[in-house]
């Protein structure tokens, strides 16, 4: 562990360079790393944690029962996603919060000095964020298909992961990483609260679940429904035109403009779909006098749970 800390400390994370295609090999590395890490955590951490949190100190528990195993698996999924979303949110904030584009969207496309897109260099820590997140969502396509509990929004999840991977790869290659890093920071923050709420619900801590679901709904609405379209998409639709030389690179410029905005708007449509589900849950919470009911995204009865 000390050796890893020493290596990390010796790396110049502020070093800048242009993105290169061969950098994407690290995306594939993380795509292979995440399932291995999840398997280890599932077996040696999350399984025991789930049993302790759900069943307490009971020594005899029929975990072979369908409902008991189903609840354990759901807890483990949420624990894994909590670990990822918390880590990537902290990484995204550490990468972006001190950069000028974190507060001024004009710097998505220009600066420092006279440098403008597409000649924007990337710091090594920004490249790390991109490979880390890209690897996770690439792995998540297969995890959603073959590993995790299949829920009501299964198709939306697959579309989301494919769209996100496409955005990450294309924005990295074509120099849109500054705005991409802020998109990652906006997206993963609310999911931290959601996974805490779900783990609390599975564990029977209803008050904690109610509090964190309320926080999740508030953060989701603020970041994905308000900030995302009026900050991110506004910049890609309007401010990008100031630096995108369509006359010089007519074909490439038009393709970049419409492809990126189409993918970003696709994410917004998914946000609105999930926002509708959240509103339904808020309504149920109000009708049940402050307590959240079962997740309306829970698995359909016709689908089998994953087996560990």
Curated annotation (Swiss-Prot):
Membrane topology of the entry: Multi-pass membrane protein
GO terms, biological process: ceramide biosynthetic process
Entry superkingdom: Eukaryota
Protein localization: Endoplasmic reticulum membrane
Any one annotated GO CC term: endoplasmic reticulum membrane
Matches recorded under PROSITE patterns: TLC
Coiled-coil parts of chain: none
InterPro entries: Lag1/Lac1-like (IPR016439), TLC-dom (IPR006634)
Domain TLC, chain residue ranges per copy: 73-287
Keywords: Endoplasmic reticulum, Lipid biosynthesis, Lipid metabolism, Membrane, Transmembrane, Transmembrane helix
Pfam families: TRAM_LAG1_CLN8
GO MF annotation: an example: sphingosine N-acyltransferase activity
Transmembrane segments: 21-41, 82-102, 128-148, 165-185, 213-233, 254-274
Function: Mediates resistance to sphinganine-analog mycotoxins (SAMs) by restoring the sphingolipid biosynthesis. Could salvage the transport of GPI-anchored proteins from the endoplasmic reticulum to the Golgi apparatus in ceramides-depleted cells after SAM exposure.
Protein name, per record: Alternaria stem canker resistance protein 1
Native source species: Solanum lycopersicum
Source species taxonomy: Eukaryota, Viridiplantae, Streptophyta, Embryophyta, Tracheophyta
